[in-house]
Amino acid sequence: MHQIYSSDVSSITSKSSIAKAEIITMEEEQQRQSCCTWFHSLKVQIWIAWLGVSAGVMAGTVFAIQYQNWIAVTMCFISSGFATLVLHLHLAYKKTQMAGWSETRLRCLAAVGATVSFLSFIAMVFCLVVAGIEHQTLDKQGLMGANLWIAAVWFFMTSKWSALTWRFARKYRAFCEESQPLLAAAPPEYSVTI
């Protein structure tokens, strides 16, 4: 039984129960037609993570070779690293390899993601304020060297991917807690001596 996300009434059936209430269910074979449901599917999330990895690597290469903006280059590659972590979490969940992971590993990933997200957001705000005060430009000449407008964009991207690392590490940790048995090992045998 699925929750209904679309307003398409033709795909639902109603069944009456004993208390004269109606239960609305969707058939298992029918596809949901909501954009929100499509966007949050695991396949789409994997593609978005791949896009984040490739965008970080390509942008880092361009900013290193053409503009020599080393702050942006560093943040591009850090952002790509967090996108890789998100991709790894999704693929491990999809391949059901996450069942053997310890809760501590996912807690550490979540803590690192939350910390880096917070620090990157503060750095983004700092870059925006300083770039505005110094009247940095976005023309060809202004982009050469340490341009804080571009650095702010990549601090934001790092903040986003590290926040997604935090979010999915917490989500998959809850999944691991549900899937693990209450007793990982057999209980110790009790011996009674008379």
Swiss-Prot record:
InterPro entries linked to this entry: HRG
Keywords: Endosome, Lysosome, Membrane, Transmembrane, Transmembrane helix, Transport
Regions crossing the membrane: 45-65, 71-91, 113-133, 143-163
Regulation: induction: By heme deficiency.
GO molecular function, one term: heme binding
Motif (Di-leucine motif): 182-183
Pfam families the UniProt entry points to: HRG
GO biological process, one term: heme transport
UniProt KW Cell membrane keyword: no
Location relative to the cell: Endosome membrane; Lysosome membrane
Membrane topology: Multi-pass membrane protein
PANTHER family: HEME TRANSPORTER HRG1
Protein function: Heme transporter that regulates intracellular heme availability through the endosomal or lysosomal compartment.
Name assigned to this protein: Heme transporter hrg-1
Annotated organism of origin: Caenorhabditis elegans
